[in-house]
Amino acid sequence: MSLFFITFFLIYGGIHFYVFMKARAAFASGITINITIGAIMLFMILAPVIVRLTERAGHEELARILAFVCYTWMGAIFIFFLTGIICDLFRLAWYTSGVLWSRDFSHIVSSHRFYFFLCLVATILVVIYGIFEARQLKIEHLVVSTDKIPYEVGKIRIVQISDVHLGLIIGEERIKSIVKAVQMVKPDILVSTGDLVDVQLDNIAGLAAFFQQIHTPYGKFAVTGNHEFYTGIDRALEFTEKAGFRILREEAVDIHGIVTIAGVDDEAIGGLQAGSNVSEERLCAEINNSQYAILLKHRPVPYAGSLCIYDLQLSGHTHKGQIFPFFLITRLFFRQYAGFYRLDNGSFLYVNRGTGTWGPPIRFLAPPEVTVIDIVRKAD
């Protein structure tokens, strides 16, 4: 965790420095203005920590306001940084062309103020749209055929939510929309593939009751994500159970002879991927191969040793980058980063884009989703 935070704040601070230098070049402001801007940026760099401290001190409303401001700023400054890099590459291309062709393109290359405002306008537009998109919950439908579903059943509907990140930003309003969407598609089984909660639970304990409104014939199941461990695993588990979920921790459950649902803890519990693999290997011995088996695992990292046992793995974690084009970074760490994948030995993996948001309350070209998976009996 400490390495993660050090890396994050170094990158986040570097991005602020880049934007500060762009503003300085565009406006040639005096020392007083530069110090003021620098102080504001320093506050925004430290704001995520300030939000957590404010929340822990019991000032929920203040923490909620600060969270929305600082995380919206976080998204905005990342977007400004990316558009700034694109503009810099464009200017470099013009400069190089001028040198190669002996042409004077200095009027295009040197207009710092124009490019600053271009980046600013692009950032504002993306942020406004991104806040809107983050609230537009999309229902994704998926049909998987198998000969393992009993004839008399024919079809079973699994609904997946993931990465809701209940907390200061994702609250009652968003939970109501999620619950409404889930109820509308009438699941046989509801699963949560981790990161249901994101902060201290004093402020969100009452939200568990909304999930209790979802009734399914065969139950609700959940696994832990990394944020359950960051929040505090005991209290996160307590909240999840109050919400009506059965938490699968290295456990497999036979659902009336129709399907098997298995789940493993996120690797954050021990910090080693190998720990999760051991859990999967042990669970494999408990699975009936003649029955359709679904593995709930927060991170989309299929383990080769269990591919022959599980027919379908449901995961989340990646958010599909949440803000385009950050999925490019996500792809560096996760080969399967969003959507439906066919794995070796005929197994499948589905990676949910996330039902909520983490950090910035913004999504751009990566809308939140509730996934509806119909597992149907193959026609003879």
Question: Can you annotate each of these PLM segments?
Answer:
Residues 1-135, 380:
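Non-catalytic terminal accessory segments
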Residues 135-149:
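Alpha-helical transmembrane signal-anchor/signal-peptide segments
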Residues 145-380:
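Soluble catalytic domains of enzymes that build or remodel membrane lipids, polysaccharides, and related
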